[in-house]
Amino acid sequence: IQVDSVCNEVIVPAPNLAPDIAESARRAALTIASELGVTGVMAAELFETPGRGPGFLINELAMRPHNSGHWTQDGSVTSQFEQHLRAVLDLPLGSTDRVAEATVMKNVLGGENQNLYGAFPEVMAAYPEAKVHLYGKSVRPGRKVGHVNVTGPSESIDRLRQVANEAAAVIRDHGAAENA
């Protein structure tokens, strides 16, 4: 889910995505990777376009682990980072099976809070199911500085989204009132 042309949230599996469009997108990505001779992870960021062409547009190709695949750190048996290393080192690839029915990844964008790690105790106490990953980058408003993953049953997708969004907001806004 994009907001202001920035990846804001990833929901796995994609809700309400028609199986034929998912299969067509999978085939297109595999064809592109094969034709380009890709070794390692290739992310194909797609936008669904119901009723137009194949039902999707390719927005971005990245020949590396990508923000849209960060959900794999907690939602897949093998993360995109480990899978990339396995591929480039010519090791057997790991399982791509999901460890839960659904995963929500919410990006943490920089705000006024400069001490992102100061929010950890609050997030861990309020949202024990949220897994926080911070990148160690300097904080600037709107810059991706981390993400939150939450996994669970697919029938709880609304709750997973709520937890991911609230946890990310706590990190972004922690201490903002004292800094104002």
Tell where the protein language model's regions lie, with residue ranges.
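Phosphate-binding core of ATP-grasp and ATP-grasp-like enzymes
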Residues: 1-17, 22-58, 62-69, 86-95, ...
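C-terminal structural cap/anchor segments
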Residues: 73-91
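Sparse recognition of residues in long alpha-helices and their boundaries
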Residues: 45, 77, 100-101
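Alpha-helix initiation and N-capping motif
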Residues: 58, 78-81, 117, 157
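Peripheral (often C-terminal) accessory segments that flank ATP-dependent C-N-forming ligase machineries
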Residues: 86-180
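Short beta-strand-to-turn element immediately C-terminal to the catalytic PLP-Schiff-base lysine
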Residues: 13, 49, 74, 149-152
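A broad detector of short, well-ordered amphipathic alpha-helices
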Residues: 27, 31, 82, 162-165
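Short alpha-helix boundary/capping segments
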Residues: 17, 72-77, 159
